């Protein structure tokens, strides 16, 4: 991660941004990337009571190559998609979790039905439910942190869906989502890499550190 940007997109900006092929094919993209796991948890089983978290994390929240991390409310997915298409015109790839990762709630439902459900009482075990939620949320938080560290920069879409409208973008941002809070907080502490720029001048190859 090199730098972060707090971005406010107006309705007029959005109208211009969504004029790209990626935005027009957004429904197809969601169906392509948001696949439902059909084989349940069988592939993750170590034994009757243990699951392989590493394999599960690689399957549900894989680490991919991307230049830009777009932090957004899921209610602003269309805006994130439009921005992703805009960056693509410049040869820059963007990470938008909804397109690359499966939904954590679906994984939780699979785990809870497998490990926490009591058929005799037709209820879920409260303690076990807390454990599955903790494990899945920790995997997701770890995956988000890894992707943020890997990307060149972060764009936070500052909208009424993601932040308190009264927030002063020059100061603190008050968010409604625990995941957006995690991303904003992580950016404050994540390592800031020195960016190396390469350019040629009069036949000589030079390097500069920004």
Model feature map: region roles:
Residues 2-151:
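Conserved N-terminal substructure of TIR/SEFIR domains
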Residues 135-136, 162-193:
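Conserved TIR/SEFIR loop-to-helix hotspot centered on a Trp-containing motif
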